[in-house]
A protein has these predicted regions:
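Conserved hydrophobic/aromatic pocket- or pore-lining residues that grip, position, or stack substrates
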Residues: 22, 52, 115
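Catalytic domains of carbohydrate-active enzymes, especially glycoside hydrolases
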Residues: 43-59, 258
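Active-site-adjacent loop and "lid" segments of alpha/beta metabolic enzymes
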Residues: 5-6, 30-39, 43-44, 63-85, ...
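Short strand-loop junctions, especially beta-strand C-caps/beta-turns
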Residues: 27, 189-191
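N-terminal amphipathic alpha-helix/helix-capping segment at the start of soluble metabolic enzymes
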Residues: 1-25, 172-179, 284-287
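Active-site loop-to-helix "anion-binding N-cap" substructures in soluble metabolic enzymes
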Residues: 3, 53-55, 170
Length: 290
């Protein structure tokens, strides 16, 4: 599958696409406050591109548990200047991480080429129109609850079939709204209304989502379920601590093995190194003496 864009093509199936996360927020769980000013944000984006990022995913509102709602106007103030400047200097596609149609529309005008909607086209009725009218690829994520209102004790009768059914409904809605089927990417939403055991099961059964015949994005980077699984201490349990990096890399390699096409990460260089090592092992051949 190929998604054509003004700045080139994203081709799925041959290589894993690495999306580097750029949060221009004061309160994101990992990098909140690091990239609040334009120069810091641009410098971080440049570092990720230098490290090999294929996409820069820019977000202006934290969606971690208990995060605060941000108005569309405030969100635009955070992301639009970064998108405008970054799009002038790089051929790398820019993704806008938002569930607000107004923000997405302005971001596309500023140079963004992909919409990453964590609400799965549920939070804003206008989002599908924006994607359709601009012929913009869109990432539809599964979420149980609302971006700022996850259930504290989520329950699934049959986890994977329920998520697949969700995607079937949202894909049908997207296509009926004018979004081209080949402009849709799915994301099972690790950590969004899921317990640690749900996240682990999704990774183990990620291949099951291939029945939808769409590219799959996975984001596990430094999420709290890693700390819970690894039983990290309070100090180690901080997402800014490197203690979550090892667990992150393992989950990402499992995702790649199980069929992920895109991985959304904070640590671009380390992720690419891990994928390269996995690929080397997978393709290794040793000639035996005869």
């Amino acid at each position: 599958m190929v998604i054509k864009q003004d700045k080139g093509c994203l081709e799925f199936g041959k290589e894993i696409i690495v999306a580097g996360v750029l949060n221009v927020t004061p309160d994101s769980f990992y990098d909140g406050g690091k990239n609040n000013d334009l120069d810091s944000a641009l410098n971080h984006a440049r570092r990720m591109i230098e490290d090999g990022a294929d996409i820069i995913d820019i977000g202006g509102e934290s969606t971690r548990p208990d995060s605060s709602y941000v108005s569309a106007d405030e969100e635009k103030l955070r992301v639009i200047p970064v998108i405008k400047e970054l799009s002038k200097e790089t051929h790398i596609p820019i993704s806008i991480d938002t569930y607000k149609a107004e923000v997405a529309e302005e971001a596309i005008k500023a140079g963004a080429q992909i919409i990453n909607d964590i609400s799965g086209l549920q939070a804003d009725d206008e989002m599908a129109r924006v994607a359709a009218e601009n012929n913009t690829p869109i990432i539809i994520m599964h979420i149980k609850g609302h971006p700022h209102d996850f259930p504290k004790d989520p329950v699934y009768d049959n986890l994977i079939p329920e998520i697949i059914s969700f995607f079937e409904r949202r894909i049908e809605y997207a296509v009926n709204s004018g979004i081209a089927h080949n402009n849709i990417i799915i994301d099972p939403g690790i950590g969004f209304g899921k317990k640690p055991e749900h996240n682990l099961a999704i990774l183990r059964q990620l291949n099951d989502f291939k029945c939808l015949n769409l590219p799959i994005m996975v984001g596990t980077s430094r999420k709290s379920f890693i700390s819970k699984v690894l039983e990290l201490s309070d100090e180690q349990n901080l997402p800014k601590s490197d203690s979550r990096l090892a667990g992150t890399l393992v989950t990402l390699i499992i995702a790649v093995i199980k069929g992920a096409n895109i991985v959304r990460v904070h640590d671009v260089r380390e992720t690419i190194q891990a994928i390269k090592m996995y690929r080397a092992i997978e393709s290794a051949k040793c000639k035996e003496k005869t």
